[in-house]
C-alpha cells in the first residue's frame, strides 16, 4: 500500500503472511521514496521477518539512489544489509550479509550501452568477503537484448584470498502474453580458468 504525501515523497507499507508450519513466515516492510528532481530519486526501506518454526527473527535495511541522465544513461548506488533471520528470497540480498553496489550504464548509441558495476559484499556471521568489478555491453535488437562482458572477482575468507576472472553471456526478450507484457531472460557466467565455477540464472516477469 503506497501513500503520496507530497509530489516528491511517497511512503509504502506491506505485510505478507504464510502459515505453513515449517516454511511459513510473517514479513512486514516500510519504504519511502523521495524525488530530488525529475531524474533523481532516493529509496529507503526496512523490513522484518518472523518464522512459523520459531527460527530467530531478522531485519533488513536498504538505501538506494538513482540518477537518470539526459542521454538515457543511468547511475545507481545501493547499500543493503540483512540479518541472519531475514532470508526472504525476493529481498535482493542474502541473509547475514551486507552489500554495497555502484553501477553506471552509459548509452553509447540508441541501441547499445555499456555498464560498469562494482560490488563489495561481506558475510555478517563469518569472515567471507567478495569484491568484484565488471564491464557488460548490451545490444538491443527490437524486443531482444543481448549481453556480453567480463568480471574480475576477489574472494577472501579465514583461509586466505583468491582472484579470478569470468565471462558473462545473457539475453532478454520482451513478449506479449494474454494481452500482458511478459519478459524472459537468461544469463550464464563462467570463470576463464575453471569450468566448474559457473553461474546460470533464468527469470520471467509478467505485469498483471
Model feature map: region roles:
Residues 1-208:
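Gram-negative and organellar
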